[in-house]
Structure formats: structure tokens, C-alpha cells
Amino acid sequence: LAVEQRTPVVHNRVLLAIMLSAWLAAFGMAFVSVAPNRLVSGSGVPLHGLMGAGPHLLWLPAALLMLAAFTRSSRALHATVAVAAALLLAALLWLAGSEARHQASALSPLARVSLGGAFWVLALLCWLAAADAVQRLGLSPGRRTLALSGVLLPALLLLASGALDALSLHKEYANRQEVFNAAGQRHLQIVLS
């Protein structure tokens, strides 16, 4: 008896390309960079080199996103993809903040943990996956904007909770808040005028 072999059918090539790119970034680039202080260059730490069980938080939303590329299109699927991308983005942020706290307690309070290339690529890919899913939902422009704002909500909650305070980016902002705020206001004036 011949066993019929079926090859998986890709239903969302955009999402598949995003997820394959994410795997390359996750395993080929540094997720964070750790330096003993501000004056010394940091050394890159890949995602799989982070301490604790934190990286395991990424598996479920990443697996859902990969599986979604092979699932027939539906509104429920697109909503699930948007939520999974938002959760993956939040998990990436939490993981970076957690590693920063760990390094600050293990090395010294002067230790600096900055976001590496893998973080930025993965964050962008999460945003692209969410934007693609929201676009496929066929929402009106106002609702699409609202849905994409909702994708950022978990990240904003993490920021407000203080979970990202140990990251060097946040430390720099805290040290030079007036300069950052003035520059931000100036940029808004330029954009809105």
C-alpha cells in the first residue's frame, strides 16, 4: 500500500517569511549586549544564552504564529495572529528587562544591558505580523489604528510597571529625561506643522 504524502500548504506566505526571518534573527544575532559599565563595549548574548526559563516564554506565541502560516485564513485566525504577535513582543521586552535585572544583580548596579540586533529585528517582525493580521481582518482605518494600538498595550504596561527600568535605554532616559522630552516635543512640532 502506497502511503500518500501530503506537503503542507502555506496559506500565508507573508507570515511564513516573517517567522523564518525571526528564526534566523533569534539564532543568528545577539539579543542583548552586556557591559560592566557605560565606558566599556558590551558583549553580545544570544537569545538561547539568556539565564533562566525566560526564553521558553517565546515558544508558545512563536509556535502559534508559525502554525498560523499553514492554517486556512479566517477572521478568528487573523485576530489570533495579532494577539500572538502582541504577546510575543511583550515577552521579548519582558525577557530583555529580566536579563537586565539579572545582570545588574549578578555583576553590579553599574552594568549596562542594551538591546541587541536580534531584539530589534524580532520586535519589528512582531509588529509586521500584527500589522499584516490586522490588515487581513478588513477593518476600517479607524478600527485598524485602534487594533494596532492595542498590539502595543502589553508593551506599554510593561514599561509602566517598571519591568524595563534596568535596561540601559531606560537608564539613559531617566538620567537625561529633560533633554529627551524637549527633543520629543520638538520632533512632534515639526511633524504636526
Task: For every predicted segment, state its role.
Residues 187-191:
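Loop-to-transmembrane-helix entry motif
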Residues 1-186:
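N-terminal, non-cleaved signal-anchor transmembrane helix
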